[in-house]
Amino acid sequence: MLERKIRLNAVADVKEFVRAAEKCEYDVDVFYNRVVVDAKSILGVMSLDLTKTLTVKYCKEDEEILEGTL
């Protein structure tokens, strides 16, 4: 699993990120403090505090798909 820090500053950023995550074959998770949500869920991602830096964990195989949005 790879880990990356991201900032999603606008709703458009969230939409773009979730669309990219949906294309991934494996699980993509977003972490903030003790909260973990599925990155393929727009409601889950929107429920996080988007003013903070989030941590994304994903498989090496999906790196190419996500790289453009991270």
Predicted regions and their residues:
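Conserved beta-strand core positions
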Residues: 4, 26-28, 54
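N-terminal-biased segments
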Residues: 1-3, 59
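Amphipathic alpha-helical interaction surfaces in cytosolic regulatory modules
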Residues: 11-27, 35-50
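Positively charged, low-complexity intrinsically disordered leader regions
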Residues: 3-9
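C-terminal structural segments of small proteins and small subunits
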Residues: 46-70
